[in-house]
């Protein structure tokens, strides 16, 4: 009887350790500096070509810039800085009232290969970030907030645009300072 009890408790302890070990996963993202990485955000050469042929996702860059420069809570279709996806989920034909610039951006993203959506969005985000730095000459916390809004918007664009096989782009802004 004691052997059976020991065997059962040892088995339970083993499964507990196995389950506990699988819960804690560490995800390491390496975001190389574009100055030292000639590929930049494009680790897949095909994506670089698509980004260049799509004229650098011009509508998406304009949309990202517009969203980043808005202060306060943002447009009516966002909630506390996060996109409100309920309208997209309830209406299978997509949102009824998408702003025209966002619709153009979504059209650009739909023309991309699913594998290239995130790399091309990252390239567009970096272009907008550079544009903001040059135009605004902002420093410190204000610049960090604008750049954070650029990447937050770009991260969720695939879901907003209903891009097949891509829901979010898990990239982070590349600048010194705390990561959000």
From Swiss-Prot:
Family the entry assigns: Belongs to the 2S seed storage albumins family.
Annotated tissue distribution: Cotyledons and the axis.
Gene3D superfamilies (UniProt xref): Plant lipid-transfer and hydrophobic proteins (1.10.110.10)
Subunit (UniProt): The mature protein consists of a small and a large chain linked by disulfide bonds.
Signal peptide limits: 1-21
Task performed by this protein: The small, basic, water-soluble napins are one of the two major kinds of storage proteins synthesized in the seed during its maturation.
PANTHER family in the cross-refs: 2S SEED STORAGE PROTEIN 1-RELATED (PTHR35496), BIFUNCTIONAL INHIBITOR_PLANT LIPID TRANSFER PROTEIN_SEED STORAGE HELICAL DOMAIN-CONTAINING PROTEIN (PTHR35496:SF11)
The organism of origin for this protein: Brassica napus (Rape)
Protein name as annotated: Napin
SMART domains: AAI
Propeptide: 22-38, 75-94
Any GO molecular function: nutrient reservoir activity
Gene name as annotated: NAP1
Keywords: Disulfide bond, Seed storage protein, Signal, Storage protein
Upper lineage: Eukaryota, Viridiplantae, Streptophyta, Embryophyta, Tracheophyta
InterPro entries tied to this protein: Bifun_inhib/LTP/seed_sf, Bifunc_inhib/LTP/seed_store, Napin/2SS/CON
